[in-house]
């Protein structure tokens, strides 16, 4: 992440953290460009996040619950400190991607989610806030 300026906005929860994640993502997109499969962007982003001294865990399973019933588990691409990060590599983010990113981690308790699409000529990023506050430790498993 060379020369990226971190811009924060107090209107967004975890603005500094998400700005750092976004700066790492921009570096990956600038270097690789569009056209690769998601896994390549995940690997490159993980390297950038670690180089930026962010605690990033890849391929985290979170538990999906209905009230007190555990329904199963769903994998998210990253947990970066207090933020869930979903990666896409397609022409554009569509409504289904946004709904999916909002819905299945809703019960996770992470205050912020980022949806990042590397597939187009310009990187697309959506910040999605979660109002729940308690979250599991991704290193302990769900």
Regions found by a protein language model. Give the residues of each.
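Solvent-exposed, charged helical/coil patches
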Residues: 1-55, 112, 123, 129-142
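Amphipathic alpha-helical interface surfaces
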Residues: 17, 41, 45, 80, ...
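Nucleic-acid endonuclease domains
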Residues: 36, 51-53, 73, 98, ...
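A short acidic/basic microdomain associated with nuclease active sites
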Residues: 52-68
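Well-ordered beta-strand positions
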Residues: 57, 77-79, 117
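Short beta-strand or tight-loop elements
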Residues: 60-62, 74-76, 121
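Active-site beta-strand-loop-beta-strand hairpin of nuclease catalytic cores
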Residues: 72-86
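Nucleic-acid nuclease catalytic cores
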Residues: 84, 88-136, 140-142
